[in-house]
Amino acid sequence: MNHTRLVHNVGVGALEWLHAHRDGFRLELDVDPEIGFLERFKPVGELALICKVLFREGVAGSRQATLARQLIEHAWCHTLDGGRMLVRGQRAEPLSPIPFEVYLPFRELGYSSPEAERAFRLNHRLDSYAALEMSPVRRLGLSAFQRRFGLPPRVPEADVVGATWLGRAPEPWTVEGHIAYDITHTVFHLTDWG
């Protein structure tokens, strides 16, 4: 088996497994208090992002594209309740960027929630939103998401990229786990996950 076929088979298997276990993405309201309500949105956002890239790059076969569309539809309609869970999350933590970051790939795939978008636009105008303390790569990601949404980034990407590990270009032999994660995400944010 060649490497391309192996990678394809792993991807197909992963997508089929996710589809078969899609009910596992539900958001229980009586979650363990040690796990934040908004933190549980992240896997749903990752799912939407992965499916968006699959569609954009045209790398999924017709069966995989159908499964991916069904996964996204399920996540939007059942897990996020048509965006209402994101609105609830934004109301619970108005300064959290998580509902916005989860929403954007769904919006780019054609889903919308006017109520969520109103909340995101309102919060975007707050000075507290721009003043949130976060790592440079996290700030770069948020600025990229704001640009993709059509909002002027509160902190321009060009002003942030130089503060990232990759932007500072230190000694490459010092890369370790967290740094490698930050490097890959710097590239992801600058290339829209390309």
Place the predicted regions along the sequence by residue.
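Post-signal peptide N-terminal segment of secreted/secretory-pathway proteins
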Residues: 54-90
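Serine/threonine-rich low-complexity intrinsically disordered regions
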Residues: 2, 11, 58-62, 112-113, ...
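Eukaryote-skewed repeat-based solenoidal scaffolds used as protein-protein interaction platforms
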Residues: 76-194
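Low-complexity, Ser/Thr/Pro/Gly-enriched N-terminal "stalk/linker" regions
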Residues: 1-53, 61, 69-73
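Helix-turn/linker elements and helix-coil junctions of extended alpha-helical scaffolds
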Residues: 51, 55-58, 110, 194
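Structural recognition of alpha-solenoid helical scaffolds
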Residues: 6, 10, 14, 43-46, ...
